[in-house]
Every structure is written in C-alpha cells, then in structure tokens.
Regions:
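Active-site SXXK
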Residues: 2-15
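Non-catalytic, conformational "gating/processing" segments within enzyme and secreted inhibitor domains
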Residues: 74, 81, 130-166, 203
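Bacterial peptidoglycan biogenesis and beta-lactam-recognition machinery
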Residues: 15-17, 66-68, 156-157, 167-173
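M16/insulysin-pitrilysin zinc metalloprotease superfamily fold
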Residues: 13-16, 48-79, 229-231, 253-254
C-alpha cells in the first residue's frame, strides 16, 4: 500500500534527460501552481506556465513519462521514502488524524481497493524496493493509461502538434485491467467510538455509493453541497444557527 503516492514523489527528482530537480526549470520561467497529488483513483501532475514556456513543460512531462527509470537511484528512493513517512507521521498526529484509517477499514472490506489509505502503511513503505519502482513505472506510466490536458492560450491544432512532438515516441504500455471493487454493503449498521486528545467531539456518518464514472456521483456531490457544503446550507442552518448544538457542519461526496 502507498506505492502510488511514493512514486509520485519520485517523479519530481529528475528524469534521464532532465536530471535536476523537476521544479527548478519551471521556477526559472515563471511557472506557478506546479505540484502533484495522489488519491483513491488517480495520480495527477499539473503546472501553470507562460505560453512561451509550453514546450519546456511538455518536454519535462514527456521525459518523466517516457524516460524516468535511468534517473531513479536507491538513494533517491530512500530519501523520498523518508519524506513520505514524515508526511504520514505529521498527518497521523494531527487532530482526528487517524479517522480515515478507521473509515476505510470499516466501510470497505478487505481486498477492496479503498480498504487502505493512499499514503500506505509504514511496513509497506519500508519494504518498497527498486524492483517495485521499475515494475510500477512499466505497468502504470504508459500513455495509454494517462490523460493529458492543455487548457488556456492554445488552439487544438497547435496542441496536437506540440503533444505529438514531445510524446509521440513514447511506446504504449501494457493493457491495465480495470479494478472495480463494487459498492460494498454492510451486513448491519456499524458504529465505532474513537478516542483522541482533543477537547471536542465529532460525529461522522458515512455511506457508500457509486464511483466517479457512474451517474450518481454528480448528484451526490450536489446533494452534499446543499446539505452541508456552505455556511448557508441546510444542516448549518438547522444545527449551528437554529438549535445551536454544533459549532460546524460539513458534508461531502468523495
């Protein structure tokens, strides 16, 4: 567990034809908002660059998609392993930092892809090897498993020409089977009380529903906004303002 996120970190440590830190050349041309994130269904990488720096951004992205492994070393893996483990410790030590472990482990059965957190366990992070790095890159980072988005000061014809120039020689990766754990149903209502060293109490109620590619996803996100996504939402009005039994309410669909 946690390898997709660990690999995300390795993607910023240089590639075969751009071996330096990934961020440095972007900073030099005035790029902003450059980062990457990993969540349950995807890893994404993004940056906002001046129009004149588009070729640089496409070169950097294509080089780490097609030519990363020659720049990855055991030292880099060990370094980023430590960074991720510190990130995990910081998150775990935050107020309610262990909540999502309980949610995922109890709401989704063992074997379901959402049963574990994206940051992973310390044991799995410790065991990640260079062989794991090579296999993950080869299996998952082909162009047939990626979506490339260019938005802003560019037309379709220019976008296709630039993308073909920089990405056209990257070979297709292996076919990746779709992982579908289905929507689990608990055999009975489940309640759990967790203690934390915080002078407040939180109540969470969770339900499972279909994924992002299913029609109900947008409906659920909209419903969550109506219920608790805004300061004027229905649960805020009822529980915070009218009955004054809560200091805050939120609702969201993941």
């Amino acid at each position: 567990t946690g390898f997709a996120h660990l690999f995300e970190h390795l993607m910023f440590n240089g590639s075969e034809n751009a071996p330096a830190d990934f961020f440095e050349p972007l900073q030099q041309v005035g790029a902003t908002d450059f980062n990457g994130t990993t969540w349950l269904d995807r890893t994404n990488y993004f940056q906002t660059v001046p129009t004149g720096a588009l070729d640089l951004a496409l070169f950097l992205e294509s080089d780490r998609m097609g030519h990363l492994l020659g720049a990855v070393t055991q030292e880099k893996l060990d370094n980023q392993r430590g960074v991720v483990q510190n990130e995990k410790r910081q998150g775990d030590n935050n107020p309610f930092g262990l909540l999502w472990y309980d949610v995922q482990e109890n709401l989704f059965p063992k074997g379901h892809p959402y049963h574990h957190s994206t940051i992973g366990s310390m044991a799995d992070l410790n065991s990640a090897s260079m062989d794991d790095v090579r296999k993950w890159f080869t299996d998952n980072y082909g162009p047939n498993n990626a979506v490339l988005v260019l938005a802003g000061d560019i037309d379709v014809a220019t976008a296709k020409e630039r993308v073909t120039k920089w990405f056209g020689d990257i070979p297709r990766g292996p076919d990746i089977p779709v992982v579908n754990g289905g929507v689990p149903t608990l055999p009975a209502p489940l309640a759990k009380v967790a203690k934390d060293q915080i002078p407040t109490t939180r109540i969470h109620r969770m339900w499972t529903f279909g994924g992002l590619n299913e029609g109900d996803s947008i409906d659920m996100q909209l419903a969550a906004s109506v219920l608790g996504g805004l300061s004027s939402s229905r649960l805020d009005n009822a529980l915070v303002r009218k009955e004054a039994i809560a200091v805050g309410v939120s609702a969201f669909a993941v």
